[in-house]
Amino acid sequence: NGTGNILLQSAADIALQAVVKSGGGNISVIAAANVSQSADGDIETQGGTGTIDLEATGGSIDMTDGAVASAFGGSLRYKAASNIIIGEFNTVSTSNGDVSIVAGAHIIDNDTDVDVFSGGLLLSAGGTISAPVETAVERIAAQSGSGNIQIIEDDDVSIALLNVSVNRLGDNAQISSIISDSENGLTSNSNGSIVFQTKAGSGSISVDAPVTADSGGNILLQAQGTGKTLTLNKNTTTGSGNITLLADSHIVQNSTVSTSGGSVDVEAAASVSMTESGLTETKGGN
């Protein structure tokens, strides 16, 4: 109750099968192996600036369908050495709370519901981010180490620089350190492609941080909906892959769009405008 903190720590697995709740304090759940979270095992802070810090230091995190992590104004961080199968993350306050999901292997979404409701969302995977991940956020950044990034956003969104911090509790259940993650824009490695779309009729996209696909990775950015715009304020580049930029209304290009040998396809239902700082280059492609 109140602002009391909660620390759950195990030298093996942790199975969350009942609600873990703090009125306004911080929660740390730290397992040396795996963490599983059932639909009855919601984890939540109910007020103030309390954060949620959950980590499987030697294994995976498995959130079953219906499992929820929520912080009423604070931030959330889930980290695993291996895969993270995601459920629902909700910071309730879109202006303050951010979510960070960091997987040593893959970030996996097994349903078609919106997975993350927050101000900012940071995704980082040693493997892929896929299925796709459905979001309802204001700002987003993501990085894949060896595969594709697939994200569908439910509203207007900025691809941005994100820094997410949570409080790590020590053995006395007091804050012992601040854990922070940082990502800038959308980045795929090892020939991974990037697919970032808003749902039909739902949102504009503002590219306020670089979008970069390694080697032959392709890039698709698509803003869907009447009056929805794709605005390119930072560079969109791939090594030798293809770039497709689509908008149901306008595309505004204030930056470089570049590939070395691939093709660039830019289509807008209303208009495409390039400012003086806009440049499109294929370096031998189409």
Model-derived features: positions:
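Extracellular lectin-like interaction modules
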Residues: 1-286
